[in-house]
Amino acid sequence: MKSSQSDYKKRGMLDMNLCNQLQEASYTELIDTLQSSHADWRTACIHLLSKKYNTHPQFTDVLLQQLVKEKALYTKIEIQTQLSQYGQISKMCQYLGCIGDNQYRAIPLRGSKKKSYPLPRDLIARSLAHMEVQRFQDFFVELPQLSYSQLLEAIDAFGFLCFYHQSLVNKETYEYIKTCILNYWDDDLMLWKLMTCLSAFPMAIDLLQELQTQQKHPTILMEVERSLKLLIN
């Protein structure tokens, strides 16, 4: 059934007319309006905060705290989009694995059969995955400091970025993934995600072929074979 204009408003679809009404609002006024019960007003506030006040010291905190409690679909999408562009990466990383319940908690029975790289399920990882390549190094230096649950989601963003931006594929990023494989060899969920990461690295063919002979877990083995197929074909 086709959604009505009212449905889109309730879900927080960005309305440029509202943005125009709020164009002259101060930072404090936008923060106050962000508490509105109307999702489309909240989306307009996020949009304008990002355009006008993205260098404010509390900008990233405001967006992250709103994302934690936000229910409206399009408002959440707007927050994620603006975090990708302007969010402080170190602060974003602290929220990895904390928002929503769509993350993998255990290795699935079957992996993806697609030729594309899987979109991260964690909302913050998804924002990180879509940031500009120029911001990658700021993300990369955060990885060693992350907790296990944070790294579990960060790896999805890392692989996504490397897969779609081959300029990020180099000895340093490849060695990092190999180190993770050694460190998490007995962790099926992390290892499965790392096998997906290897699909971004053309130099990983020999390693994947070796892993193909060693790996016994059926889902991990399927991911090894999927990555190999993508690299060879």
Could you describe each region identified by the protein language model?
Residues 36-40, 71-72, 100-103, 117, ...:
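Short inter-helical turns and helix N-cap capping residues of alpha-solenoid HEAT/ARM repeat scaffolds
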Residues 2-22, 40-55, 65, 74-87, ...:
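Structural detector for internal amphipathic alpha-helices that build alpha-solenoid repeat scaffolds
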Residues 21-35, 53-68, 88-108, 133-144, ...:
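Amphipathic alpha-helical scaffolding segments comprising HEAT/armadillo-like alpha-solenoid repeats
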